Amino acid sequence: MHELAQVKSARGKFVERKYLAMLDTPLESSGTLAYAAPGRLEKHMLAPREESLILDGDTLIIENKRTGKRRSLTLQENPVVWGFAEGIRSTLNGDLATLRRFYKVALEGDFRAWRLRLEPTEPRMRQAAAEIRLGGSGTWVNRIEILEAGGDRSETVITREPS
């Protein structure tokens, strides 16, 4: 976790697949991700529609490019969203103390190939997600998997963009 805390910024491309019990094939989306320490994370979905999620401090902004609609949420007023956001952001920050505030944390592997399992401790968040799994190599997070409480799941694979 200490090494992750040293990363000041990172950029990558993602492909996310959502596996829903009611569908035979996964839903797929793709786009770009950008991180700037300590608290800014941007997810720009480019396909199948253009949408942006920007986490900056304690605010999450959701913007639909097609409709022009923009919504802003304060994390502390939305505990489930806050928990999800901190699961990703605190991992990128190497902030184990904050992770433990929201999750039971288990780290496996070594620096070259690691896996972090996060089990929500907050009851409302447990109703949404059973577990979040992040995997990486060195200071790069290359995989995020969210296992929802109802059995659906999403897998996100992240490839690094050259700086």
Write out the residue ranges for each language-model feature:
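Amphipathic hydrophobic-ligand
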Residues: 25-31, 131, 152
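Short, charged/polar low-complexity linear motifs in solvent-exposed/disordered segments
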Residues: 60-62, 70, 80-81, 88-90, ...
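An acidic-aromatic
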Residues: 32-83, 154
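Flexible, processing/modification-adjacent segments and terminal tails
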Residues: 1-19, 24-26, 40, 64-121, ...
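Residue-level recognition of well-ordered beta-strand positions that form the cores
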Residues: 13-15, 32-34, 44, 117-119, ...
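Gly/Pro-enriched, hydrophobic low-complexity segments
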Residues: 96-163
